[in-house]
Amino acid sequence: MADDGGPFPLSSSLLHASSSTTILESSSSSLLATSSPAIAATFSSFSGRPSSYLPPPPLPPPAPSTMVGWIGWVFSFVFQVIPSILYWAITFCTITLPTWLFTLFSMSLTFTMNFTTLLLIALAIVSTVSWFIRYRFLNMYSRLPPEPQRKEPQLDLFPDVQEGDSKPGLANYLDEFLSAIKVFGYLERPVFHELTRTMQTRKLIAGETLLLEEEKGFCLVVDGLVQIFVKSIRDGKSPADHELNLAGDDSTDEEGQNVDGRQGYQLLTEVKNGASMSSLFSILSLFTEDIQLRTSESLSSSVSSVGPNLARVPDSSPSSPRGLVHSPVPVREPSESGHNLPTNGEFLPTVPPLHLEESRGTPDHDHQPESRTRPGKKRRKSVHPDIVARAMVDTTIAIIPASAFRRLTRVYPRATAHIVQVILTRLQRVTFATAHSYLGLTNEVLGIEKQMTKFTTYDLPNDMRGAALDRLKDKFIKERDRLGHEEVTKGIALHNPSAGRRRRSSSFLRKEAALQARMATTPRRPTATGSQENMSFHDRDAAGVSPGDLLSTIQLSRFGPRYEHLAPKIYSPLAEKEQSPFRPPTMRGPASPFHRKESLDEDALFRESILDCIMKALGLTSSTRDILRKSSHNSGDASPKLLSYDSRRQKAVFSNNAFGFIDPYEGSVDGETESMMSMSVTSAGGTSPIVNLREELRNDIEIVYFPQGSVLVEQGERHPGLYYVIDGFLDVGMPACDKGDDLVGATRPAHGEEAFPTLKRTTTASSRTSSVAPGGSDSKRRRQSRKSLYLIKPGGIQGYVGSVASYRSYTDVLAKTDVYVGFLPRASLERIAERYPIALLTLAKRLTSLLPRLLLHIDFALEWVQVNAGQVIYHQGDESDAIYLVLNGRLRSVLEGTDGKMNVVGEYGQGESVGELEVMTESTRPATLHAIRDTELAKFPRSLFNSLAQEHPGITIQVSKLIAQRMRDLVERPMTEKGAEHGAGSIKTATSTVNLRTVSILPVTAGVPVVEFGHRLLNALHQIGVTNGVTSLNQAAILNHLGRHAFTKMGKLKLSQYLADLEEKYGMVLYIADTNVNSPWTQTCITQADCILLVGLAESTPSIGEYERFLLGMKTTSRKELVLLHADRYCPPGLTRRWLKNRVWINGGHHHIQMGFRLTAEPSHPQTKRFGTVLKERVQVIQAEIQKYTSRRIHQTALYSAQTPFKGDFHRLARRLCGRSVGLVLGGGGARGIAQVGVIKALEEAGIPIDIIGGTSIGAFNGALYARDADVVPMYGRAKKFAGRMGSMWRFALDLTYPTVSYTTGHEFNRGIFKTFGDSQIEDFWLEFYCNTTNISKSRPEYHSSGYVWRYVRASMTLAGLIPPICDEGSMLLDGGYIDNLTVPHMKGLGADVIFAVDVGSIDDNTPQGYGDSLSGFWATINRWNPFSSVPNPPTLSEIQARLAYVSSFENLEQAKTTPGCLYMRPPIDPYGTLDFGKFDEIYQVGYKYGKEYLEKLKNEGTLPLREETEEKKKLQRTLAPRRASI
């Protein structure tokens, strides 16, 4: 085998070998592998078979049938078949395959071609690669998965199961009765049984009449229909005779004297099942029959005498206390029965005679003024004068007699006070607010307050005038000269050294109350012969110090000897009674020697004298106390505990409890089980003077000086407290423009404030409430157009009705002169009413005695209606029979289309009205109205309007203004607009975010930190300043106030009253669902919400959580918004779409919030880290520290970071909920839009937050850049990069195409926008964003707030002819500027309060043309190039087409400039063209400079919406500041 002589000798030798041996075949194969192809061919010829032939692997023998055969077969398979297979595989890999490869690579090919062929081949390759890059790599934007715009959810009206009488028999009877007595509020079991145990039922047949003036009790309809008629007073008198005289003229005729047969009756209202036939005022009359209008013993001492009239009293008169009582003071002494009070031009017989003689217990009446009794005067004992009821069908009525109310007042005084407080609240919400704000009956309403002064005027003692008052004034004069005008205008308070005593904790007060309650069980109470000498030292000290103590001790020699014999004679008749903290000063014994040093202080003497006068004005004397004290021990735990809601509020001026000072929610539900807190307070409550109230309130009185022109109380705000006038005059008036213009719900809040005084919201920064400083120009303008109503003289009290009943002020109160007042904050009044409900009963008595006849009839006809969540009030097409005023809750008006779709027309919150247009025009209902949640309504029937229109035509003028305003709104915003189809959604209308009162925070699933989220949102709402404040509720807060029975069936009504109280008290209430999904509190949070915030963790799974399933099961129609919490300020593309994909019920939008949170708690024993991990972290820390000093990059926080004050995410959400969002609208204009980047930077530096962004064309591009990161730094970089691409002409040149549709293909334009935004979606933007386009397929504008950003920004930037339209769901979209280049109206519809609109559009040449009736194109061309021609150049064809395209846009632009709340900005960018993108820096600086100058101008004018001007600081200017600027 080593022979190399040639192949033949070797081959011949191989012929002698056996060809069947595998060794020779292997050798021949080995030789073939190393020989040439010729040798292989020769070998093939000798062997007679091809060289590639290999023997196939042998087949295994057939399987035997015996056991031995099986063993032989296996042996043969292992030692024969397997080696053959291995041999075949090795041979193929080592011989056959290399042979094939060698043969292939040994071949040679020759191609011959010319240069043209090579060029074509190269061109083909380049084209193929270009096509691949262009349409497969650079065209990625066209292959994104389809993400169409999110369809807004259709509104579903759930079946109305509330209609009709579904419960027959006894169940229906009970339901109607219970619904009728809901007017009393929550009634505990003993109180309910006491009221109903003497109830009587009466059957009326159809047509039977009932004289309600003969029915002395509370009447209600159980089953049937009753019409209420009133006797007409149209007897030839002019309407002016029936107006209330605010000038104080008491010479009026008695009502009802001219009754003759010509007078008929007019229909007031129709009373159906479950409604009351009695008015609120008549109910108050039933409760207050035994209450005095004015206390008599208030004049029983010279210290509390009636001021100047005492100068006419002889010296001998004080020897008898009774002589001083009946001193002739006809001006101060009111009518005994109240019949001679001027009420609407006539005397009002509305209440039964007040037997004050019996209550006073004085037999001698010869000292009464002559005006007490009028000869021939007819005294009516009815609380329903001139009211007749007629049954339309067979009717069953129930009557609770007056005796039941009298007994209830005696047995349960605190429960009575609670009922009176509820009725007073509803009286203000229903009757007074409707008469004042809706019907324009301001004179009638304010006349009650004016005439209330004759009950509340008590002069200071004579000793407090003269030299003492001069010394007091000197202190203020010195301080006034030291302070500036601005500080003095806020008021100067006299320093109170004892003010620190007020700040004792409530727990200490409760302990003290409980201790004194145990000490009060001494045998002193039943003694009848007690005297001052028998009092212990502790009792003397507890009795408190009064001005009388000063006079009876060391001051006697100073003021004269006449007081030495006065004190014992006055004290002796009352010696047998228990000593009262409100006893007149001279009725007390000698004071404790420990108080003598303090009695020298004249300031303390002033304070105590003022407190005495205020208490007498409130009706707090020993005699009035004894009226309710008879059965105080019987009014045990069954009566509600009279506690204020928040005992920590020392800032009385900020409390606005709707139920005033009586909180009926501290007691238990069933009256049998009590919580420990309630029990501890029970001992301090009631009418027993356990804690010395005088001692507590003495330090709360503040003496304040207001210079002339200062504002003490503003119209629409809650009274901060009582102002007692020491010296000077207070002018009570109202803005002249408000008379007749303050319409309830006259327009959407975009046109002004809500009209009900219960909701005074700041609509814009330039509104009336934006500046409270009296020295401001706004205040001066208000004073000039102000109408003065009446003056409050020294000794009078301002704010009595508003403070005690917790009403809002209908008037402004200014200082007519330099005025010195004593101020008692409302928190102190709460403590008074806690222990002495007589204060509320006295107020109720006085109100009923002063009620005008007109208001009585309105009160009779107005019906208080309570509807459940989801209940339909009326359907589309129903007959219009009443106007509805929203007292509490929220309504939604829905328009049902012919195709079954429902579009939201509007939403109505607290204080708004609905339905007046169709009622006055007697047309059918244009839409369906349903309650979003549990709602209280005031039903104003059409019959009442007809009755008022006949007797008081002035009311028709007022309502006519309302109808005209509503018609104007319909013209500007038609009800059938298609906004639900192509706008921002079916729920996101202009009214959906306005007037939200309750917001629920609901987690998507368990584990979401809703409590921390709620606290942060609450802090943000406090900082931006919500009108009337904001509070939050969780289950713990509810249980603390209502006890463990808060969520039982018995406690449901109590809970609803408590929540309604909070809604009236605060501008917004947050409900935090911090319990499990099936808890009653979670259900309460859902049913009470105007808006529900579904909070979820963005990084968690977007599946539907258990709370959402529970929410869907509740079938609520409230507005629902999604809040996604992010750990970092970044949202990955497509994340929001995954959350919204399956949540079709999210109808209010979504919000991205950055909030640091921890999903899992830290382990108590942290795990030890590995050495490598620790070393890596340490190196990273060191590296970061080194880069701080070596890196050239400037490290700074973004301008729009979450930590920036007033610009964080929670503040943005808070402004959204309050309807105070700041919108930014960017117009289109090509390269001129670069100036918008500079304007946005100027807004950032000015500290103005931006919440919503909308744009058109280049404005859509810039707005999307800013909305993506909410930061101007990345926006600047991306905008400059895009401008560089747009400035390159080569890109457009390479994108040119045959101009059938456009000059370019649009690819380069698409590519530039896609490189900027990528696959981001509008839902992922950090700020809310939209852009508008023009749909030329359907000839309408469209607004896009979801989908891929690049597509709709590209569509909004599409210029016709230059770029082809973009296709979207079959429609072609073009530049939105063709229809509306500045979308301010749409931004306003999204709820933005202040809108910055930046217009960068081109200005067309408006030069007058005069080329004649015909035009030669040759002449026009020559004239264009002729420098000496004076004829203006005619527009070209392209210019004419462009102007034609923008015709509608110009009209919308002019409308946008005049939109309320819009701040129009136009930088000086006219010299720049549409395609001047190469001048980026120059145009940017122009916009930045203009923005700085414009905002500085707004700041100097005071119209810039600065973050410092919040409601809380406005209140501080007038309330807390005077306390600080003290002497």
UniProtKB/Swiss-Prot annotation:
Q: Which GO biological process annotations does it have?
A: phosphatidylcholine catabolic process; regulation of phospholipid biosynthetic process
- List residues binding a nucleoside 3',5'-cyclic phosphate 2: 846-966
Q: Which GO terms describe its molecular function?
A: lysophospholipase activity
Reaction(s) the record says it catalyses: a 1-acyl-sn-glycero-3-phosphocholine + H2O = sn-glycerol 3-phosphocholine + a fatty acid + H(+)
Instruction: Map out region (Disordered) in residue numbers.
Output: 240-259, 299-387, 576-596, 750-785
Ranges of the Cytoplasmic topological domain? 1-69, 134-1527
- What ranges does the record list as Low complexity composition bias? 761-771
Motif DGA/G — list its residue ranges.
Answer: 1375-1377
Protein's UniProt name:
Lysophospholipase nte1
GO CC terms in record? endoplasmic reticulum membrane
- Tell me the first and last residues of the signal peptide: none
Membrane topology category: Multi-pass membrane protein
- Alphabetical list of PANTHER family matching this protein: NEUROPATHY TARGET ESTERASE SWS (PTHR14226:SF29), NEUROPATHY TARGET ESTERASE/SWISS CHEESE D.MELANOGASTER (PTHR14226)
Q: Where is this motif: GXSXG?
A: 1255-1259
Question: Which Enzyme Commission number(s) are on file for it?
Answer: 3.1.1.5
> Lumenal topology: which positions?
91-112
Its transmembrane ranges are: 70-90, 113-133
Q: Which gene encodes it?
A: nte1
Q: Where is the composition biased (Basic and acidic residues)?
A: 355-373
Q: Sorted alphabetically, which keywords does the UniProt record give? A: Endoplasmic reticulum, Hydrolase, Lipid degradation, Lipid metabolism, Membrane, Repeat, Transmembrane, Transmembrane helix
Q: How is its activity regulated?
A: Inhibited by organophosphorus esters.
What does this protein's UniProt record list under function? Intracellular phospholipase B that catalyzes the double deacylation of phosphatidylcholine (PC) to glycerophosphocholine (GroPCho). Plays an important role in membrane lipid homeostasis. Responsible for the rapid PC turnover in response to inositol, elevated temperatures, or when choline is present in the growth medium.
Task: Name the residue ranges of motif: GXGXXG.
Answer: 1228-1233
Leading EC class: hydrolase
Q: What are the residue boundaries of the PNPLA domain, all occurrences included?
A: 1224-1388
Taxonomic classification = Eukaryota, Fungi, Dikarya, Ascomycota, Pezizomycotina
